[in-house]
Amino acid sequence: MAHNNVLLAIARAVEERITEANAKAKPKEVKQLAPLQSTFVRAGQALDSKKKVTKKEAPHLLQAANDWKCDFDLPEFRSPGSSYVFPHVVALTTLKIDGYIISETARICIVLELTCPMEENLVKQHSFKQRKYEELASEATQNGWRFEKLIVEVGARGFVPSHVRKTLTRLNIKAKALINKLVLLAQKCSYVIWINRFNQDFQTWRLVEK
């Protein structure tokens, strides 16, 4: 329940930024960005001020094109009878990827992966997600695509690791506002699940607009 509610909020924010980027007349060249794992901070750990991200260090990826398309593994993005499929032109894979953003002219594919574990499992899940797409990234690169993976974690009790802000900034998303929304969604979902823990007729539903 929490996963898809949080993912939908992210997807709507991505759609807004894509619409804005596609309205730009002239794309800019965006250099390769540093991997995110170097900025992962555990719950309760202080953030080193020297590692704070500036706009100069993290230009957003959507500057590189103006023909972006996105899709997410959510029913809100499916028409009746359609299936969610990762673009075969990038790579062939059976992996279930939460979402992707693609520009065919710039040959850039950005995959987005969300996980909503218990806070004590955040570090393990982050490492797992980093390794999960190594083969896919290699194949995409061999096929002539620039491949970027963006990983977002939101803990079941609402903790959001510090690197998530940088991740969202890479897509030109107003990180603070969206993170506050994701925190509230995760907490609400956990509360709903808790109060329905003995309800055998419980069904999930959306806590954000469709």
Located regions from the model:
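Short beta-strand-loop-alpha-helix junction that forms the active-site gateway
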Residues: 96, 108-128, 154-156
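Short, flexible loop/turn elements at secondary-structure junctions
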Residues: 74-76, 101-103, 116-118, 155-158
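Active-site metal-binding core of divalent-cation-utilizing nuclease and nuclease-like domains
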Residues: 9, 22-111, 127
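Short Cys/His-based metal-binding microdomains
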Residues: 1-14, 109
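Short helix-terminating capping/connector loops at secondary-structure junctions
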Residues: 25, 29, 142-148
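Well-ordered, non-membrane alpha-helical segments in soluble/globular domains
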Residues: 5-7, 126-135
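Metal-dependent nuclease catalytic cores in nucleic-acid-processing enzymes
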Residues: 14, 130-144
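Domain-level recognition of nuclease-like catalytic cores that cleave nucleotide substrates
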Residues: 147-210
